[in-house]
Amino acid sequence: MSSPVTAQRPPAAPPLIAVDAMGGDHAPREIVAGAVRAVREHGLRLALVGRSSELAPLVAAEQAARELPIVHAEEALAMHEGALAAWRRARSSVAVGCKLVRQGTAAALVSAGSTGGVVSTATVRLRTLPGVLRPALALVLPTTPTPTILLDAGANADAKPEMLVQFAHLGAAYARVGHGIAEPRVGILTIGSEPGKGNKLARRAAELLSANATEDRLDFRGNIEGHDLLAGLVDVVVTDGFTGNVALKSVEGAVRFAFDEIRAALTSSPLARFGTLFQRRALRELRTRFDSETYGGAVLLGLNGTVVIAHGASRAEGIAHACLLAHNLVVGRITDQIRRGIAGVSRTPSWLHRLSAPEE
């Protein structure tokens, strides 16, 4: 889940966004349809990356040949492919999209493909920014009044305390650029709100964040428990990718269960169905707020380029919003913000820079 995306005014010459047209459960048809919506409804400039023989007829059917150029890529990542795809699929649509970003032809990449495959391919081909140990997958939870950013949501199953400190700065930069939060509050996800709670990783990361909060210009608020993820107590929640992904899936499952129970209760009797008529608008707004189709997706932070990973089940609306999110981050110069933020906090042991690529 993540926060609804709103459009910023496009510049005179919108940045080009490369869209992986072969990634996702409903590729390429829904990807093409979403790209068309992004171009026509939001004025974005996109290029589809994938097998031209499959994409050209779909683009022609949308009468969008002049609006959506196609960059041919021979291969596509399967949804089950993980980290090894970065080496096995050198000619995949994700790899070609990363090449466009690296060359400066495109400003960002959007993909609904396998998260593991996209993360590993982007990390290998774009490389991390100077001083960044590992990229982190960041998404936003639909809290009020402002969204809460959760990272890492699955890019790194294992992490070191120094990595979590960097994740805090990556998330803070995203909060400022993507959501207009001037002074993001940062917390670390653990098993108790009191100082000193949690495993060695959480405790050491909290110590580092507390000790350097003033010098690093970071508003660290301490520990956050799982039941407070949606409470809006902080703007950025930091954890390792294993814990973050479990927390995310737990929240998604709980929300799905709650909506199923609400639906069952509202249709349990004629009187209940009648009462639903008076709550239809509020229920629709609530569902939209938690529906991944109305959100942009997760952002892979810390690379030499902007990468947005949409939900694998995204249809046209979800893809359009992912493209809009990528556009807004490029316009907000998210990469430069992260580069400046990390430059002042890269006080980490040199051996950490030799950590292996993200796990599957």
UniProtKB/Swiss-Prot annotation:
Family assignment? Answer: Belongs to the PlsX family.
Whom does it interact with, and what assembly results?
Homodimer. Probably interacts with PlsY.
Q: Does the keyword GTP-binding apply?
A: no
Q: Which InterPro entries match?
A: FA_synthesis, Phospholipid_synth_PlsX-like
Source organism (scientific name) = Thermobifida fusca (strain YX)
| Taxonomic classification | Bacteria, Bacillati, Actinomycetota, Actinomycetes, Streptosporangiales
Q: Name one GO cellular component term.
A: cytoplasm
The reaction(s) catalysed by this protein are: a fatty acyl-[ACP] + phosphate = an acyl phosphate + holo-[ACP]
Q: Does the keyword DNA-binding apply?
A: no
PANTHER family referenced in this protein's UniProt entry, alphabetically: FATTY ACID/PHOSPHOLIPID SYNTHESIS PROTEIN PLSX, PHOSPHATE ACYLTRANSFERASE
The Enzyme Commission number assigned here is 2.3.1.274
Name of the featured protein: Phosphate acyltransferase
Cross-referenced Pfam families, in alphabetical order?
A: FA_synthesis (PF02504)
Q: What does this protein do?
A: Catalyzes the reversible formation of acyl-phosphate (acyl-PO(4)) from acyl-[acyl-carrier-protein] (acyl-ACP). This enzyme utilizes acyl-ACP as fatty acyl donor, but not acyl-CoA.
NCBIfam families in UniProt = plsX (TIGR00182)
GO terms in the biological process aspect are: fatty acid biosynthetic process; phospholipid biosynthetic process
